[in-house]
């Protein structure tokens, strides 16, 4: 069994930014890949994609209850655009409607912004896990900004010890190994939005901040979706083996399906780790579905 902890779709995708799947297209993709169920994360922040409602996600999941699991989401600026907005009321409302988590949170704000911290506080109060995407710039991007070394994430983990926070995306996974320069944390594009600018140097294999944070804070979990964890975990298979052994109970398979025309090698990657003996069958089962079943109460 495979559960995708991080996926997206729209009932009626718009022809802008990226070609998302509709529900039927996502089911077809999942069938091809051997994915049994997928968590659907509503996009509510307008920094890059067009916002969708939590109710759209609930309607999709109600139509295909055996294939999709709903999350809810809310922009931290919603309701009163302040650090005391009663966001917990919204989260409680959608939790009662069946939503199993929160995300993908990705406004281009600082992680320690009081309004963002208010959202995390509400998530902890309601008792739902939260996944966010990060950024290494404070404007012109999507995702919560953090400093090199992920100090804002660490302070958030300290402040909300009962909140399960999922690390995800380039800024998080760039720090699996020690950075050579802060610019390695993210991607910068040409003004026309085409090719990526710059060339990265030799890849480090010295342990970075992420495993240190995982050892310090049991409320930090890892979302293995998008290409960045696959790239990082392909650098040194000896280290990858140790990483999966040590953190096997907090790693979750995911794809971050947000372009129906792109190849997603995630199932092949995790199966190859099993075939090559990098991970055991027990770890494979945990990462592909057992951890998600436990987390979401399925």
Predicted regions, residues:
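Conserved, mostly hydrophobic/aromatic
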Residues: 6, 30, 57, 61, ...
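Active-site beta-loop-alpha junctions enriched in small/polar residues
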Residues: 8-10, 43-45, 73-77, 106-108, ...
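Mobile, glycine- and charge-enriched loop segments
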Residues: 1-19, 53-83, 210, 218-221
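Catalytic pocket-lining loop regions of alpha/beta-barrel enzymes
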Residues: 113-253
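Hydrophobic faces of well-ordered beta-strands that scaffold small-molecule active sites
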Residues: 3-7, 38-40, 69-72, 102-104, ...
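Active-site gating/metal-coordination segments in enzymes
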Residues: 36-37, 45-148
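Mid-to-C-terminal alpha-helical segments outside catalytic/metal-binding sites
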Residues: 1-37, 245-252, 258-298
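Short aromatic-enriched loop/helix-cap "lid" or pocket-rim segments at secondary-structure transitions
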Residues: 14-17, 51-53, 116, 142-144, ...
């Amino acid at each position: 069994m495979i559960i995708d902890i991080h996926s997206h779709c729209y009932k009626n995708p718009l022809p802008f930014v990226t070609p998302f799947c509709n529900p039927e297209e996502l089911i077809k993709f999942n069938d091809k890949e051997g994915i049994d169920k997928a968590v659907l994360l509503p996009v509510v922040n307008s920094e890059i994609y067009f916002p969708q409602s939590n109710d759209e996600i609930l309607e999709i999941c109600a139509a295909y209850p055996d294939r999709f699991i709903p999350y809810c989401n809310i922009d931290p600026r919603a309701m009163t655009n302040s650090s005391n907005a009663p966001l917990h009321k919204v989260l409680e409302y959608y939790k009662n409607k069946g939503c199993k988590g929160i995300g993908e949170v990705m406004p281009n704000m600082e992680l320690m912004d009081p309004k963002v911290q208010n959202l995390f506080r509400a998530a902890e109060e309601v008792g739902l896990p939260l996944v966010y995407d990060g950024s290494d710039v404070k404007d012109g991007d999507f995702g919560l900004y953090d400093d090199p070394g992920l100090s804002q994430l660490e302070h958030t983990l300290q402040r909300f010890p009962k909140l399960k926070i999922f690390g995800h995306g380039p800024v998080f996974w760039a720090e699996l190994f020690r950075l050579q320069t802060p610019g390695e944390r993210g991607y910068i594009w040409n003004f026309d939005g085409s090719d990526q600018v710059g060339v990265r140097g030799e890849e480090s294999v010295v342990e970075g901040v992420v495993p240190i944070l995982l050892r310090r804070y049991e409320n930090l979990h890892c979302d293995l979706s998008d290409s960045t964890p696959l790239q990082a975990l392909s650098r040194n298979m000896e280290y990858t083996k140790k990483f999966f052994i040590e953190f096997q109970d907090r790693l979750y398979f995911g794809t971050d399906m947000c372009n129906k025309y792109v190849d997603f090698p995630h199932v092949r990657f995790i199966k190859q780790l099993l075939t090559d003996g990098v991970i055991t069958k027990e770890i494979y089962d945990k990462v592909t579905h057992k951890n998600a079943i436990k987390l979401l109460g399925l």
